[in-house]
Regions:
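Alpha-helical, largely C-terminal catalytic domains
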Residues: 1-177
Length: 177
C-alpha cells in the first residue's frame, strides 16, 4: 500500500475521535467530544507556551496535545470520576489504550508510526518537560470546561482527583459568570 493511502486510512480512523463523547456537558446541553477537547487543549498550548519560563520545544508541545487522546477513538473516554470510584479501571484503561494505540498507528508508514508512538508514550509516561506541561494543561482545559456546564453545574469535579479544589475554584468562577 502506498504511503498516502496509509495516511488516508489513518485519517479515517482518526475521524472516530470526533464521535467519542466525554462526560462533560456543554453549556448548550450537548456533550463534548474528544476532538473538541484536543482542539481546545492545542489552543491552550499555543496561548500558554509564550509565557513558560522553562525552555521547551513548542512543536513537540503541540504534537503531544494532538496525540494524547487518539487511543480513545477505539477505547472511548474513561472519566476521572469513574477511575476514582474504581481504581482497577485505571489499569484497564492503560492496557486497552496501549493496545488501541498499537492498532491505530500500525496503519501508518513506519516513520510516522514510530514518531507518533514515541510522542504518545512520552505523554503517557510524562517522560519530558513538554509531556508534563501538556498533562497539566490537559487538566486545566478540563477545569476550564467545568465552568461551561449547562446551568453552571460543576458538581462533577467533587468526585475527581483534587476534586474538592476544582469544585471550589469552579464555584468561585461560576459566581463571576
Amino acid at each position: 500500500m502506498k504511503k498516502i493511502d496509509k495516511i488516508i486510512n489513518f485519517m479515517r480512523i482518526l475521524e472516530e475521535v470526533c464521535v467519542v463523547n466525554r462526560d462533560l456537558v456543554l453549556f448548550d446541553g450537548t456533550k463534548e467530544n474528544d476532538a473538541m477537547h484536543i482542539f481546545k487543549l492545542s489552543f491552550l498550548v499555543m496561548l500558554i507556551a509564550p509565557y513558560l519560563k522553562t525552555p521547551v520545544n513548542y512543536t513537540k508541545l503541540l504534537e503531544l496535545a494532538l496525540v494524547h487522546d487518539i487511543a480513545e477513538s477505539k477505547t472511548g473516554d474513561y472519566t476521572a470520576a469513574n477511575q476514582m470510584a474504581n481504581p482497577s479501571l485505571k489499569k484497564e484503561k492503560q492496557k486497552k489504550e496501549q493496545q488501541a494505540i498499537k492498532e491505530i498507528l500500525s496503519i501508518l508508514p513506519f516513520q510516522l508510526h514510530k514518531k507518533l508512538n514515541k510522542l504518545y508514550q512520552e505523554y503517557e509516561h510524562k517522560q519530558t518537560t513538554e509531556a508534563k506541561i501538556v498533562s497539566v494543561l490537559d487538566k486545566l482545559e478540563a477545569n476550564l470546561q467545568a465552568n461551561q456546564y449547562k446551568n453552571g453545574d460543576v458538581n462533577y469535579w467533587k468526585n475527581c482527583e483534587n476534586g474538592e479544589e476544582y469544585y471550589k475554584i469552579a464555584l468561585e468562577k461560576k459566581a463571576l459568570v
